[in-house]
């Protein structure tokens, strides 16, 4: 029964919230304790029996470029904070399971984990609706879960099983869900696609925007700047989100970028930098960014300052280009899950014992999902499967060409069209 409470529910539009919250946060070398107070005012979307809280963010939470930063005060429900905590714990347990499965050689190939960066996926999802689009780089497992995929479907895909979100054909870098367009294995290639998603929203007069995520390592790609230009030229509702985790593979940002204030890279596009280790600040900044785009102001560059605890990928120990002391300092002083846990206890949303029970239930739930994913069969070893899953089901063409014309597949015949 406990496991059922961790099933990801579709996000709903949060209305009537002001701006940001205050939490223990650290930007650069500044660490500040937030102040919070309960309020009697209830938002209409609050679930029955829950109270709202007023959250005050430290002044160091944001740094802006060509715009006024978000408010440092906003109101949200206790239920929302609790759900965000549960989601971050699930994502971390899922990533830890990926680590173990990779080491057990059940996951092969590329695998990029986001342990330490959970606040970004969870904070964004709580600030938007299912009408909005998200597209990311290859570090995408948490986003896939937050967009509605099950832990089982994510892990099954990583293990090459038919129950995976891409039917076992995509692997770690090619995960998809409704409103989530991947996962992209080419550095920076998702950015122009994200601009295209924003154009589609604009063309169809949809009340939605595109959150297009890329890393500091991709920020110097030419196609990123080309996308900036097109987005500003056409006033597209796109939020260019730079996940600055300080290292592009094993190269520190300062060694690869002449200017590391990525939120200012848009030049003619306003920008905002936010403490990406603080989910409450991430939520407020993301909501601000969406409101900015939908108000007709055009694109926005949003930089999330974050940190990955592990290496670039499973083949990288992550300790040859940074010290263990640096990693431990970030874990002990800036962990997004530990920070939100403190708020849950301080606000009386949950006791220490209840939080431990949530953690235990999350561990049990993910373990069960691992077993289900591991038990799922791989794609059937038949020739026709190479030509399946190209088109949306129900829209398939009668034939599909392969590498050469002679390799054209006939779906009705279930064989090559030009062969007996």
From Swiss-Prot:
Transmembrane segments: none annotated. Phosphorylated at Ser-313 by pyruvate dehydrogenase kinases PKP1 (PDK1) and PKP2 (PDK2), and dephosphorylated by pyruvate dehydrogenase phosphatases PTC5 and PTC6. It catalyses: N(6)-[(R)-lipoyl]-L-lysyl-[protein] + pyruvate + H(+) = N(6)-[(R)-S(8)-acetyldihydrolipoyl]-L-lysyl-[protein] + CO2. The modification Phosphoserine is found at residue 313. This is Pyruvate dehydrogenase E1 component subunit alpha, mitochondrial. The keyword Ribosomal protein does not apply. Pyruvate binds at residues 112, 138-139, 177, 185, 187, 216-218, 245, 247. Residues 1-33 form a transit peptide. It comes from the Eukaryota. The pyruvate dehydrogenase complex catalyzes the overall conversion of pyruvate to acetyl-CoA and CO(2). Thiamine diphosphate binds at residues 138-139, 185, 187, 216-218, 245, 312. Its cofactor is thiamine diphosphate; Mg(2+). Keywords: Magnesium, Metal-binding, Mitochondrion, Oxidoreductase, Phosphoprotein, Pyruvate, Thiamine pyrophosphate, Transit peptide. E1 activity is regulated by phosphorylation (inactivation) and dephosphorylation (activation) of the alpha subunit. Its EC number is 1.2.4.1. GO terms for cellular component: mitochondrial nucleoid; mitochondrion; pyruvate dehydrogenase complex. Pyruvate dehydrogenase (E1) is a tetramer of 2 alpha and 2 beta subunits. Eukaryotic pyruvate dehydrogenase (PDH) complexes are organized as a core consisting of the oligomeric dihydrolipoamide acetyl-transferase (E2), around which are arranged multiple copies of pyruvate dehydrogenase (E1), dihydrolipoamide dehydrogenase (E3) and protein X (E3BP) bound by non-covalent bonds. It comes from Saccharomyces cerevisiae (strain ATCC 204508 / S288c) (Baker's yeast). GO terms for biological process: pseudohyphal growth; pyruvate decarboxylation to acetyl-CoA. It is found in: Mitochondrion matrix. GO terms for molecular function: metal ion binding; pyruvate dehydrogenase (acetyl-transferring) activity. It is an enzyme of class 1 (oxidoreductase).
């Amino acid at each position: 029964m406990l496991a059922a409470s961790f099933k990801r529910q579709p996000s709903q539009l949060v209305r009537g919230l002001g701006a940001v919250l205050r939490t223990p946060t650290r930007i650069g070398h500044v660490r500040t304790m937030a102040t919070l107070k309960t309020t009697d005012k209830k938002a209409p979307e609050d679930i029955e029996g829950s109270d709202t809280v007023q959250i005050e963010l430290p002044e160091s939470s944001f740094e802006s470029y060509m715009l006024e930063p978000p408010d440092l005060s906003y109101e949200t429900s206790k239920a929302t904070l609790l759900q965000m905590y549960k989601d971050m714990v699930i994502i971390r347990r899922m990533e830890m399971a990926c680590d173990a499965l990779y080491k057990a050689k059940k996951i092969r190939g590329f695998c990029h984990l986001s342990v330490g960066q959970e606040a970004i996926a969870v904070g964004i999802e709580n600030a938007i609706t299912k009408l909005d689009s998200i597209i990311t780089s290859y570090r995408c497992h948490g986003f896939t879960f937050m967009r509605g995929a099950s832990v089982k479907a994510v892990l099954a895909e990583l293990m090459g099983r038919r129950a995976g979100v891409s039917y076992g054909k995509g692997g770690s870098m090619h995960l998809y869900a409704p409103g989530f367009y991947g996962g992209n294995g080419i550095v920076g290639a998702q950015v122009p696609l994200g601009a295209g998603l924003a154009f589609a929203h604009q063309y169809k007069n949809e009340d939605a925007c595109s959150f297009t995520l890329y890393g500091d390592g991709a920020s110097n790609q030419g196609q990123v700047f080309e996308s900036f230009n097109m987005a500003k030229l056409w006033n597209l509702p796109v939020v260019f989100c730079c996940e600055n985790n300080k290292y592009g593979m094993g190269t520190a940002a300062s060694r690869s970028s002449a200017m590391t204030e990525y939120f200012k890279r848009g030049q003619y596009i306003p920008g905002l930098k936010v403490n990406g280790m603080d989910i409450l600040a991430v939520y407020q900044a993301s909501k601000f960014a969406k409101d900015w785009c939908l108000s007709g102001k055009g694109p926005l560059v949003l930089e999330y300052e974050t940190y990955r605890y592990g290496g670039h990928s499973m083949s990288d120990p992550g300790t040859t280009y940074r010290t263990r002391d640096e990693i431990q300092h970030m874990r002990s002083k800036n962990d997004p899950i530990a920070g939100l846990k403190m708020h849950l206890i301080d606000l009386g949303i949950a006791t220490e014992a209840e939080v431990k029970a949530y953690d235990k239930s999350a561990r049990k739930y993910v373990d069960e999902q691992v077993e289900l994913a591991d038990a799922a069969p791989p794609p059937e070893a038949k020739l026709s499967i190479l030509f399946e899953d190209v088109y949306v089901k129900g829209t398939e063409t009668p034939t599909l060409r392969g590498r050469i014309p002679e390799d054209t597949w006939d779906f009705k015949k279930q064989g090559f069209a030009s062969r007996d």
